[in-house]
Amino acid sequence: MIAHKQKKTKKKRAWASGQLSTDITTSEMGLKSLSSNSIFDPDYIKELVNDIRKFSHMLLYLKEAIFSDCFKEVIHIRLEELLRVLKSIMNKHQNLNSVDLQNAAEMLTAKVKAVNFTEVNEENKNDLFQEVFSSIETLAFTFGNILTNFLMGDVGNDSLLRLPVSRETKSFENVSVESVDSSSEKGNFSPLELDNVLLKNTDSIELALSYAKTWSKYTKNIVSWVEKKLNLELESTRNMVKLAEATRTNIGIQEFMPLQSLFTNALLNDIESSHLLQQTIAALQANKFVQPLLGRKNEMEKQRKEIKELWKQEQNKMLEAENALKKAKLLCMQRQDEYEKAKSSMFRAEEEHLSSSGGLAKNLNKQLEKKRRLEEEALQKVEEANELYKVCVTNVEERRNDLENTKREILAQLRTLVFQCDLTLKAVTVNLFHMQHLQAASLADSLQSLCDSAKLYDPGQEYSEFVKATNSTEEEKVDGNVNKHLNSSQPSGFGPANSLEDVVRLPDSSNKIEEDRCSNSADITGPSFIRSWTFGMFSDSESTGGSSESRSLDSESISPGDFHRKLPRTPSSGTMSSADDLDEREPPSPSETGPNSLGTFKKTLMSKAALTHKFRKLRSPTKCRDCEGIVVFQGVECEECLLVCHRKCLENLVIICGHQKLPGKIHLFGAEFTQVAKKEPDGIPFILKICASEIENRALCLQGIYRVCGNKIKTEKLCQALENGMHLVDISEFSSHDICDVLKLYLRQLPEPFILFRLYKEFIDLAKEIQHVNEEQETKKNSLEDKKWPNMCIEINRILLKSKDLLRQLPASNFNSLHFLIVHLKRVVDHAEENKMNSKNLGVIFGPSLIRPRPTTAPITISSLAEYSNQARLVEFLITYSQKIFDGSLQPQDVMCSIGVVDQGCFPKPLLSPEERDIERSMKSLFFSSKEDIHTSESESKIFERATSFEESERKQNALGKCDACLSDKAQLLLDQEAESASQKIEDGKTPKPLSLKSDRSTNNVERHTPRTKIRPVSLPVDRLLLASPPNERNGRNMGNVNLDKFCKNPAFEGVNRKDAATTVCSKFNGFDQQTLQKIQDKQYEQNSLTAKTTMIMPSALQEKGVTTSLQISGDHSINATQPSKPYAEPVRSVREASERRSSDSYPLAPVRAPRTLQPQHWTTFYKPHAPIISIRGNEEKPASPSAAVPPGTDHDPHGLVVKSMPDPDKASACPGQATGQPKEDSEELGLPDVNPMCQRPRLKRMQQFEDLEGEIPQFV
């Protein structure tokens, strides 16, 4: 029986290579001769054979690990298992213990550890492991020799060297064998043995796949448990931190309390441990437990599905091969039967042929040949069927082998995958319990230290200190401390109330918010016991343990000496206080609005906003302001603002107490803009203010602001809170992205955007012009034609003016809101390097919300989609040039300004610095520039290069444009120098005589005029015209006493209603040096510089009634000029007008001329040669007296100005009937001819002829 087993073992291990297999086979063969020997027990031989087989397997596993490119750890594990098996054999079979065997094992261990696995690759693998392979062969050869000698009896038992194998054996000193128990002794299998065991099972793949699926479900449950547990712990830590902070604040202000420092330390330990636990939870949720395990589970699921699909494919192939084999076998049997039938038929035919004779022989021969042919065909078919059957058998065998190999590979892959998953699970489990152990150990240590400290406290110690402090004899020191403490503690107030009142601040106070929040600390330094105990007496509820509902244990002012407290106010009705009772009460003190008013709600978690209320129990059902559910039970009500909510909603309440009745819910999102704007004094919705303010406080540098979406649930909650609480909502608890979403949602849901539907086409046309200018800039950016760059600047200025004109047509509330939003977005763009949001990105986001067409039912077309880019481009332009477009303050909605009433905000401008003076010159030169055609020279382009910059410092931000210098030339610069030098002489030498401006009419207050029936001309905005009216530095020297009754507020800066209020304008005419101007004009004529045509449309108030003014000029000389009610224009050269605005030492004043009302035809020109006498056209034309117009001792100025009027071309073209339907009595009363409105004059070809004239300097009148 033993011999039979040995033969079977020899056949099974015949594939093993090397000397080891040969030696083992020889030794096993030697067992035959020793089987009959009585000294060898059969059980002992069987055990010896099993040990030898196990040692052989270990050697083969080590070789396979080296050949299969395994990791260093795997090879070391295989070596460790080999040495462990060898050691067990030597301990069990002492006859095999030999020095040679131990030396061979030691050599193998040294060779394996000497290999540098980082340098191993496919090329040098054989060279690096050559010595390892030789060591393995040496160990196998030595073991085989010893075993052969022992079994063959060549060496006696006594001759064998029996060395005890101790733990200090050098062969095993570096391998941790003792700590690893034998896997075979425990019943465990090696990886290959696991695969071999599963291979014997027909359903091995299904079993392994089911185990992998079960592992995934198991891991999913573990991860779910850990995540839920961590979330609960995280929520608990947050609540613990809130509770500890509140308690620490409350006990911090109370002096001489027993174990106060101990409990403070305990609270600090709770806060610190909570923070550490939060960090631990975050780490476990990230890369310490949840994420690695989920990643491994997902990988397991993915590979399991792939393996399952592969196994199905292999099974299908095997099934197809077996079906083909069955079909081939049936076909072969069928062909064999057919062949047998043909053969038997052939045999009968031959017998008939032999028995036949005569004439039948021929027929029988034919039949015989036929049947022989059939027999041959049947035989051929049989052979073909047999060949097909053999092929199918071969195919089935190949498929079966492939299936076995695939099965083996799949089992190995699944085993590796399961081992990896187990390794990951082990690692993350170790992390989980290790981190929890560290957390618990630190908490245990801190609790032990607190316990030891509490044992050292002496009862009554703090009370003794309190008595000593109160009976102190140093009264002056105490009084000083009292005053010092009161002054220092008074501004601090109560933290929650002060920290929440900053919510509704405007952006200008945003810099103080963080300082205010930081100053609301509850820790009070100095002798605070004076405040807590000296003033006031013990209350009944606190000293005698009165009502537990009247005061809260969490209150800041629970101390008996809280002198800020007042007696609780009870409602007059006995059940609930009415709104009238609340309105008649005096404002609450800070102590009443703090957390000391919680009463019975001391155990309820409250938000910061909830702490500002003074709650009481609700006694009648109503609606909750937080969740909008019906409150029946567990409801609370604020005694001051009557806010009602569930007790559970106090933790998330965001509405602050306003100390007066809270208004009802408003319809904010999707409501008409005017309904919200009319409730604000400046017309800007409160939601726009508080959202922009909060974003500017803490999110200007947040990356992706206004682009990243927020939490939908929190956004809806904030929208609901804003409708319920309006400006009393504390939005600091919400994230910045949620606030941005609310702001965008409000703008998107407006029925009509800030830019009205009726102005949509004009703004889209403006956006197209902006696109055209941008394209020209891109094309000419790299060109060498620098002369065209000033023209680009002129185009930009023209677009700026047009945009200002269009924006002034918006209602005051729309304009102010758009101004506020654009300025806010400009601040966001200023931090584009941090938040990655430039003006283009914001234009794409806010474009469709700020300007959109009137909604229609028409289908969406490509052209309508293309308008989105125009909307975004317009908003981008407004943001980029916001400082130039919105150069004034906001417009109040209702401000009265009547003729003759002195406005408080209309005072003369202060003296300007040289830089501001240059800016104002450039700005004013732009007001009188032409919008139609402006030619510039090379000198102008050079000045433009020095002066144009759209990104200058903020001190020049009120200037209309930084490229206004392109409208001035060298003549202006020279005139500036001489005019300033002349002005300096006047200031040094003498004081100019005052110029008084008086009115012939009384300056009594008048009521507001009837609303206008005609639209104001929009060729230039009103604020541009009025900016030139008030006296400034240059004309202030020549105007001493100015009647401010003639000046009115600037609508852009002081908020004059453009539709309802009439305005009074004072025009100024300054003198100039005749000789200086002549030089300038000669130089200007040589350069053929600027030829500009301007038209200044005066305000509408002068179109309805005249204003008579009187100028007293340096003595008794005066001129009375009556301004007609008809509109008049003032065409003038922009360069000369700019020069005449500067004062001169020769002629400090210029003559004032009445306006000319007779308008020329649109095909004529305003050109007029020099005239020695300047006429004033009033009731009739007559020469003006030089003595009346010019001061004594001065010559006549041939370059005077004539003020004229030109109707608005838009009004003339749009409403011709209205213009011509005016009654003629007004003009007849003033003696003025009836003149039809003149249309806007296009540029004529004849103008070029006048520009080319060289005989004389052109003069426009």
UniProtKB/Swiss-Prot annotation:
* Zinc finger (Phorbol-ester/DAG-type) boundaries: 612-657
Tell me the GO BP annotations in alphabetical order: negative regulation of small GTPase mediated signal transduction; regulation of small GTPase mediated signal transduction; Rho protein signal transduction
Q: What is the protein name stated in its UniProt record?
A: Rho GTPase-activating protein 29
Query: Compositionally biased, Basic and acidic residues: which spans?
Result: 998-1010, 1133-1144
Q: What is the effect of changing residue 552 to C?
A: In a breast cancer sample; somatic mutation
Keywords, A to Z? Coiled coil, GTPase activation, Metal-binding, Phosphoprotein, Zinc, Zinc-finger
Please list the residue ranges that the record marks as compositionally biased, kind Low complexity. 541-559
The UniProt annotation puts the region (Disordered) at: 481-501, 541-600, 981-1011, 1117-1153, 1178-1238
Q: Which cysteines are joined by disulfide bonds?
A: none
- Look up and give the organism this protein is from: Homo sapiens
Where in this chain does the record put each Rho-GAP domain?
A: 671-886
Subunit relationships: Interacts with PTPN13/PTPL1. Interacts with RAP2A via its coiled coil domain. Interacts with RASIP1.
The cross-references to PROSITE patterns, in alphabetical order and at most eight, read:
F_BAR, RHOGAP, ZF_DAG_PE_1, ZF_DAG_PE_2
Gene induction = Strongly down-regulated in mantle-cell lymphomas. Up-regulated in migrating glioma cells.
Site Arginine finger: list residues.
707
Ranges in a coiled coil: 296-418
Q: In which tissues is it expressed?
A: Widely expressed. Highly expressed in skeletal muscle and heart. Expressed at intermediate level in placenta, liver and pancreas. Weakly expressed in brain, lung and kidney.
Q: What does this protein do?
A: GTPase activator for the Rho-type GTPases by converting them to an inactive GDP-bound state. Has strong activity toward RHOA, and weaker activity toward RAC1 and CDC42. May act as a specific effector of RAP2A to regulate Rho. In concert with RASIP1, suppresses RhoA signaling and dampens ROCK and MYH9 activities in endothelial cells and plays an essential role in blood vessel tubulogenesis.
The GO molecular function terms of this record are: GTPase activator activity; PDZ domain binding; zinc ion binding
Which residues are recorded as modified (Phosphoserine)? Answer: 171, 176, 179, 190, 499, 519, 552, 913, 949, 1019, 1144, 1146
Pfam families registered for this protein in UniProt: C1_1, GMIP-like_FCH, RHG29_45_N, RhoGAP
